[in-house]
Amino acid sequence: MRPDGIAGFALTIAAPAKINLALHVVGQRADGHHLLESLVTFAECGDGIGLAAAEADHFTVSGRFAPDLSPSAENTSGNLVLRARDVLRRELASQGRAAGPVHLHLEKNLPVASGIGGGSADAAATLRGLLSLWGASLEPARLGSLALELGADVPMCLDGRPLIARGIGEEITSIPDLPSFAIVLVNPLVEVSTPVVFRLLIRKSNPPLVLPENLRSTAAWLAALASMRNDLEPPARALEPMIEAVSTALEDAGATLVRMSGSGATCFGLFADEKSASLAAETISASQPRWYVRATRTAGKSG
């Protein structure tokens, strides 16, 4: 997203990529929802949501990955941005508050169905942007409930800060001491179905995520991360072999830690510094020009 916002819109809200540094599947509820424990951070890159008051509701899309959105993206039922608008509008209407017509624009910079929370981040950004545009506010707990109606990953995307998510994603604990990492995101531009990955998961109850106390240095955090895992990575690799090629490319480029994010197919590599990350991204892009490759930083504590 351009740093000066999306041209022609009164307001632009960033929708940063969500990175699952670790994702442990620890159980399954009777209703079928899986219980997760995930260490999450957010990247400086992502999608963008433009908002402006309008005479009638309007939705437009641009960006590298706009053509990859399904035809249903312009229908309310298949679009988290429009669903977020409608859920928030109904909530405000129930309180007798105005929520007028709006032009929403999605700048789609992240690959679709890629394991880095693009749709969820877009929905969260839409909720935050519309509250600002409409001059409204909600109690944090109520906003979180509305976000959960849209999807399990939406509540964690509201603040864009490092956290641990538990339950189905709604139990959120802030992790203010997580360092900012130089990171490279790589996706081979193959979509991976989250429901299929979960169905292929053989063991539904795995060891929990354990976060050691007194992690004071980046090195200590990296050691802790190395002991964690993404339980969805083995079934995702079985479903899409290109994930292994992506991981290998990051390892060969010198990443200190490589792991898949979410249900894939995006993998990330953590690097010692931004220069190393940029060089790695250039190397991978040169050998795989059709892949999505992005060097960036994550949210977190500097120094």
Curated annotation (Swiss-Prot):
ATP binds at P111, V112, A113, S114, G115, I116, G117, G118, G119, S120, A121. It catalyses: 4-CDP-2-C-methyl-D-erythritol + ATP = 4-CDP-2-C-methyl-D-erythritol 2-phosphate + ADP + H(+). Disulfide bonds: none annotated. Keywords: ATP-binding, Isoprene biosynthesis, Kinase, Nucleotide-binding, Transferase. Its EC number is 2.7.1.148. The active site is at K18, D153. InterPro entries: GHMP_kinase_C_dom, GHMP_kinase_C_sf, GHMP_kinase_N_dom, IspE, Ribosomal_Su5_D2-typ_SF, Ribsml_uS5_D2-typ_fold_subgr. Pathway: Isoprenoid biosynthesis; isopentenyl diphosphate biosynthesis via DXP pathway; isopentenyl diphosphate from 1-deoxy-D-xylulose 5-phosphate: step 3/6. Gene3D superfamilies: 3.30.230.10, GHMP kinase, C-terminal domain. SUPFAM superfamilies: GHMP Kinase, C-terminal domain (SSF55060), Ribosomal protein S5 domain 2-like (SSF54211). GO terms for molecular function: 4-(cytidine 5'-diphospho)-2-C-methyl-D-erythritol kinase activity; ATP binding. GO terms for biological process: isopentenyl diphosphate biosynthetic process, methylerythritol 4-phosphate pathway; terpenoid biosynthetic process. Catalyzes the phosphorylation of the position 2 hydroxy group of 4-diphosphocytidyl-2C-methyl-D-erythritol. Belongs to the GHMP kinase family. IspE subfamily. This is 4-diphosphocytidyl-2-C-methyl-D-erythritol kinase. It comes from Sinorhizobium medicae (strain WSM419) (Ensifer medicae). The gene is ispE.
